[in-house]
Amino acid sequence: MKVGIIMGSKSDWPTMKLAAEMLDRFGVEYETKVVSAHRTPHLLAEYASTAKERGLKVIIAGAGGAAHLPGMAAAFTSLPVLGVPVQSRALSGLDSLYSIVQMPKGIAVGTLAIGEAGAANAGLLAAQILGTHDENIMAKVEAFRSEQTESVLANPNPAED
């Protein structure tokens, strides 16, 4: 495994699966797990503190509401932690964004956008991080970026379909 995708509850999976799909696109191995900062704090501590020895290189943590999962995961590991604020009914995920982005100096969490775009970009960013030491992954990331450019250039007029 290279990437761990964790989320506060199973209800976060529809959002977090976009991170998994992005990693699939680049052929990056990952594991998924529900780990609640509030309901299973000891499991979270064990998961994050053993992540490096289990072969993980990056952790993607998605959470809604109080969204303490990414910050607490970062507190227990020296690996990069990417935080995804999951969009919620209350406050549309803005509360989660503030929770994840406002980390104290010395405990870093790379915070992505709220919701599906954030989850997909977390997968992309994890692949880019891994790609700095894996030419195969980086080649796939670069091909993806080229495909995006080509799709825009192929359809420059929004009035045409």
Curated annotation (Swiss-Prot):
It holds the Pfam family AIRC. The keyword Translocase does not apply. SMART domains: AIRC. Its EC number is 5.4.99.18. The keyword Membrane does not apply. GO terms for biological process: 'de novo' IMP biosynthetic process. GO terms for molecular function: 5-(carboxyamino)imidazole ribonucleotide mutase activity. Substrate binds at residues 9, 12, 39. It catalyses: 5-carboxyamino-1-(5-phospho-D-ribosyl)imidazole + H(+) = 5-amino-1-(5-phospho-D-ribosyl)imidazole-4-carboxylate. Belongs to the AIR carboxylase family. Class I subfamily. HAMAP family: PurE_classI. Catalyzes the conversion of N5-carboxyaminoimidazole ribonucleotide (N5-CAIR) to 4-carboxy-5-aminoimidazole ribonucleotide (CAIR). NCBIfam families: purE. This is N5-carboxyaminoimidazole ribonucleotide mutase. It comes from Vibrio vulnificus (strain YJ016). The gene is purE.
